[in-house]
Amino acid sequence: LSSAGNAEIFVAASIDSKPRRLTINKSLETSPTWSPDGRRLAFTSDARGKPQIYEMPANGGPMRRIPTNVSSYCSEPTWNPIKENLIAFTAAVSGGFQIALYDFKTRSSQILTTVSQSAVEPTWMNDGRHLVFTQRQNGRMRLMLLDTETKKVSSLHVPDFGDASSASFVY
């Protein structure tokens, strides 16, 4: 949301409650994702100039940069619904974008995809193992399935299917 000209993170207890602003600064905060236990939020912020992944308590408090260390441009975090220690995100790598994974336990990241054209918008499936992401292929947007353990990527499209992006699942 934005009431001051820059995107900020807000929460509300219900549809009838007044939204409460969690981030208050001049940087842009976008793409919030809840931890599985509902106690933390991860999001994208350009507080240091370029987009990076941050986290904070869901009830407010200081935001802390997650040290992904794979790119100076990281965005679109998505928290694993089962494995609370894992966040997938989009990272700028070698002139394109790839899907990466951060592990809070090991405090390390790894690039999961090596597609020739950009991979963006990761979304976890409810099994906590697979991600669906958007890939640009020959000028078209396609949904792809990534097995995070084997790093195998499969297309979810049939040849005549049109553009598709921004997958979302209800659990």
Pin down the residues of each PLM region:
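Sequence signature of WD/YWTD-type beta-propeller architectures
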Residues: 1-171
